[in-house]
Amino acid sequence: MSLEVIEAQTGEQPVATVLILHGLGADGRDFVPVAEQLDLSSIGPIRFLFPNAPVIPVSINGGYQMPAWYDILGADITARQDEKGMRQTQDSMNQLIEREIERGIPARRIVIAGFSQGCAMALMTGLRFPERLAGIMGLSGYLPLAATLAAERSPANADVPVFLAHGTRDGVVPLPRAIASRDALTALGYPVDWHSYEMEHSVCAEEIADMHQWLLRVLA
């Protein structure tokens, strides 16, 4: 699956890459303003990648076609999951990461991040990627295909830093689902940096500040 990717660099010869996956119904432009608020100049020039999800029918929305990383089959997002669609997106994200490595950015200097559906795919991809990444950042999402993670997870990323953030009033991905995801990762030994905020299914200024500090740490 070939994806259109919006690319932005803060300077020539970037020293790290941050790959950010948008949520259901959005596109890559959605998180460009957030990235612009992340001053990582102390690390050096950064390349940001914002891929656009393919437009597919989404079952929970009556089959209406919209940008989505995978199909949502029902209101309970973990009861029935579109494993085929998730695996296809995982392959596409692997290809994007591998392309960055070919462009001269070591895997240890690459962060994969995402919001909502994008969070799910960032976790799915990053935890299974065969080379050690700098970190995984998940916003307002959940751990997909959790039952397969123990068998499929990458030994190289067994201790990869994970940033998870969620709104306490999220009506799209309820907070208990995010807490269950956090606890599942912690039980497997991942170092999870957990944050919750008084907000709905969105991003807030305090969260962006926490993302900034975490990125400075994992990319230092």
Task: Report the location of each language-model feature.
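Primarily recognizes the serine-hydrolase "nucleophile elbow" in alpha/beta-hydrolase
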Residues: 101, 106-157
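Alpha/beta-hydrolase-fold catalytic nucleophile elbow
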Residues: 51-52, 113, 137-140, 165, ...
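Short beta-strand/loop motif that positions the catalytic acidic residue
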Residues: 164-166, 170
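Short, proline-enriched alpha-helix->beta-strand connector loops that line the catalytic pocket
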Residues: 157-162, 188-190
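Conserved alpha/beta-hydrolase "nucleophile elbow" surrounding the catalytic nucleophile
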Residues: 22-24, 110-115, 167
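C-terminal catalytic histidine-bearing segment of alpha/beta-hydrolase fold enzymes
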Residues: 176-220
